[in-house]
A protein has these predicted regions:
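Hydrophobic helical h-region of N-terminal Sec-dependent signal peptides
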Residues: 10-15
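Bacterial N-terminal signal peptides that target proteins for export
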Residues: 1-9
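Bacterial signal peptide processing site
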Residues: 22-25
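First exposed extracellular module after export/assembly in secreted or surface-exposed proteins
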Residues: 29-167
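C-terminal motif of bacterial Sec signal peptides marking the signal peptidase cleavage site
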Residues: 17-20
């Protein structure tokens, strides 16, 4: 009996600690500037359900469009900065040039953990997160033409900011 109570107490404390570790700053819609909400509505007029967060000074809308999980980022002046689309692990969601570059590249035998498409005013890029037993997970960034822009060890920090540079 005492062991069960201790297990429940441990579980309760774990839930409290883990929920306190959430680094996202959820934002009620009432705290999002009207200009940002209007910019979102203009860009995504068919989306009804939106959850807002504030990340690194950006207003981030999380939503689903046509069953696909997406995030879009606006700055404080309501200027659209980036949209992230979750392609899950389906290489077929990638342009042919990107698919081919990955499948014929150095990491072709690694397992794809996640794929995201990023659209910015400066253009589109793709992030393929990969893993392989005994190796550190990697993040591969490709442009639309299949050029590998960046190959880095995955830091477990899943946030790609709109101002990411490939230099």
């Amino acid at each position: 009996m005492k062991a069960n109570i201790l297990k429940l107490l441990f579980l309760f404390c774990s839930v409290i600690v883990l929920s306190a570790c959430d680094t996202d700053d959820d934002l009620p819609s009432s705290k999002v500037p009207e200009t940002v909400k209007s910019a979102f509505d203009a860009k995504f007029p068919t989306v009804n359900r939106v959850e807002w967060e504030k990340k690194s000074g950006y207003y981030v809308a999380e939503f689903h469009e046509n069953g696909v999980e997406m995030q879009t980022w606006f700055d404080a002046d309501a200027v659209w900065c980036m949209t992230e689309t979750d392609l899950r692990t389906d290489l077929n969601g990638l342009p042919g040039l990107v698919q081919n570059a990955f499948q014929t590249g150095e990491y072709a035998d690694w397992r794809v953990d996640d794929i995201d498409k990023y659209e910015r005013p400066a253009g589109v890029f793709y992030l393929i997160e990969i893993e392989k037993n005994g190796q550190k997970d990697r993040d591969l960034f490709y442009d639309e033409n299949g050029n590998l822009l960046k190959d880095v060890v995955d830091t477990e920090k899943d946030t790609v900011l709109p101002n990411i540079s490939f230099n």
